[in-house]
Amino acid sequence: MNFFMDIRDKVFAATGKVKADTIFFGGLLINVNTKEMLYRDIAVKEGYIVGIGDVSSLKGDETEMIDVTGKHLCPGLMDGHVHFESSMVTLSQFAVPALAHGTTSVVIDPHEIANVLGRGGIELVLDEAATLPLNAFVAVSSCVPATSFETAGASIDVDDIVSLIANENVVGLGEMMDYPGVVFCDETKLSMIRTALKERLVVDGHCPALSREQLFGYMCAGISTDHESIEYEEALEKLRLGMKLMIREGSAAKALDKFLPRLIGDGVSLENVFFVTDDKHPSDLLKGYMDVIVRRAIELGLSPLDAISMCTINAAKHYRVDHIVGSLSMGRKADIIVLEDLEKFIIDSVYASGRPVESFVPSYEYPDTVFNTVKFDAVTATDLQIMSDADKDHRVRVIKVVPDLIVTENETFVLHSDRHGILMPDVENDVLSVAVIERHGKNGNIGTGFIKGMGLRNGAIGQSIGHDSHNVVVTGVDHSDMALCANTIRSMNGGICVVSNGKVVEQLELPFAGLLSTLPAEEVEKKLTDLHKAVKEIGCALPAPFITHSFIALPVIPSLRLTDMGLFDVDKFSLVSPIDEVME
């Protein structure tokens, strides 16, 4: 990924002193700068556009001519905010389906890897990104760990930020999830923001359901985007106050159908709105990426030109990279989607830097250190139980998951302890046991609690993906099955596991930082299909169970969470006991 071609070389190519490598001729160019569609040929040299329109003077004897007569030429699409680690494959393997579906640029916040491997992990991502045809811009992770109420494998401080933002691929400071730290003026968080703004980088936000005064303070700190709005009125108010609105349409959290029709109906300007995924599961990624969002936006009533703009130039302008990507314009990268049908957004072929994307083959080699990150002692059923007074009713706090959202609700439920004082799950009412096991070899913490909405009828599920500190999260009906699940993940050095009736029925190894596979997305998706089938057979009907499950431990999104340190009330921003009351 080369973001810069020598100016002299560009000028020579544009003026015909050297001839173009490739010319696309006969196509209808989609111009997101003027919202026009015009018949224009495009000349490309060393991956950059050096001529548009009559480019006959740039044609040489060795220039490749690509006939796109009758087709539309669209700028490569851009995902304005994604944690690529949610695909469960490495960045190189992620690039393959992304490019195939017309996404040629992404802004990645690699805070999953950062929480495990720290600054070195981000440097590794930047190094890998530089080898790819995918334009992988980086927003440096700002909240590692997300709070002090969990144990991460590493941390990112101001000195790390200073070092990392010197890289030319860095375009901003990643989402500032610690909004209390901002509004109460934590000096570390403010120093991070100052450092980014001083270098003219953007600072992305993460601020669901703030009070009006909190939002004022948060925005005045210099934070300019949000993708976490829960209700339309909240999103609209942020736009009115001058924030850029990211409409998120990922695998677990979806807002496109909720927000876009109302924005269109209210006649709101969309120039400060762009599309993001945040998280994309491999099964969804293989079916489509940003092209799926463009297609759906058109179905919801947006014009193709506006839908494409919200997936290209709008995001590029926000991140101040529109001089490189985001449009088919002079001097920009020749990232071109050839469309068979504009209205249905059917892709014929994709070119990154003027080359067909199918020519890319992942080849990056990773250091051994990334494959040894799951470090906890084997656990027993007893380690995962909550004990109290024997043979009594207890009012307990329960994490209630919400389908299609990553917010949770804070509920209470009455559970009865057995004669040994063990609080047992209530399977009939879908109140199950959940545990978070510290896996970075730091302290051996185990947080325990109760969860509703997973739907398991027997067995357990577990994974070493647990946003954001990525400790092992295990939910189950039976504590012995939960222990088996956790210990299987330990033996795999990271992954996902489903246990039923005392046996491991499916598992997926994720040895890279306990988060990713080095296999192609197709192979990971096949294994995930088996995992989804297995978890459905033990009762879970959630549309994206492992993504939903992975957010149980994230203590910056309302309302109730579980970390390795214990149950966390996000609204109170404090740890609370899983037992609310022992009832007489």
From Swiss-Prot:
It catalyses: adenine + H2O + H(+) = hypoxanthine + NH4(+). Keywords: Hydrolase, Manganese. Its cofactor is Mn(2+). One of its GO terms (molecular function) is adenine deaminase activity. GO terms for biological process: adenine catabolic process. Its EC number is 3.5.4.2. HAMAP family: Adenine_deamin. Belongs to the metallo-dependent hydrolases superfamily. Adenine deaminase family. This is Adenine deaminase. It comes from Methanococcoides burtonii (strain DSM 6242 / NBRC 107633 / OCM 468 / ACE-M).
